[in-house]
């Protein structure tokens, strides 16, 4: 990977809405070079998607997020990959990580309601033959996600004094 690719990835990670013209100026390369480099990174699977960071608390959309620690038995000749693939195919699962430590996989999951999320864990996830245990942690509040701070800049930070 060359320096231009690394520079573009760093810039796009911060703001993927920047026009090609601005990216060309920021990197000191021609518009054509930048466009071709980005196109090649998309074709090669380096850039998979452009997506915003959304503060869902400021919308009417109800949703429940959780992180689930999963202990599994790895499969012969496939290790954790086959188990992870089976799990990441569930619609509720947004992210899957292979972890070191007390558990094997960490899932970031999302459902519309607590009941839906509980149903997912009890009937879909924990019933898989390779899953030996789970621990579910519900997200109560987001402070930062993908490098973006979820702070209300207009919030009154004075302490409330009651008589």
Residue ranges and their predicted role:
Residues 1-163:
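A compositional/biophysical signature of low hydrophobicity enriched in polar/charged and small residues
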């Amino acid at each position: 990977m060359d320096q231009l690719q690394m520079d573009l990835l760093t810039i796009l990670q911060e703001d993927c809405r920047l026009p090609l013209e601005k990216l060309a100026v920021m990197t000191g390369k021609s518009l054509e070079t930048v466009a071709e480099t980005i196109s090649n990174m998309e074709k090669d699977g380096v850039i998979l998607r452009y997506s915003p960071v959304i503060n869902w608390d400021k919308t009417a959309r109800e949703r429940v997020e959780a992180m689930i620690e999963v202990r599994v038995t790895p499969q012969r000749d496939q290790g954790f990959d086959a188990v992870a693939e089976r799990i990441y195919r569930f619609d509720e699962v947004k992210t899957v990580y292979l972890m070191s430590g007390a558990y094997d996989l960490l899932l970031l999951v999302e459902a519309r309601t607590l009941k839906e999320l509980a149903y997912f864990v009890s009937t879909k996830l924990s019933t898989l033959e390779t899953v030996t245990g789970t621990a579910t942690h519900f997200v109560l509040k987001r402070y930062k996600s993908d490098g973006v701070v979820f702070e209300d800049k207009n919030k009154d930070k004075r302490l409330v004094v009651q008589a």
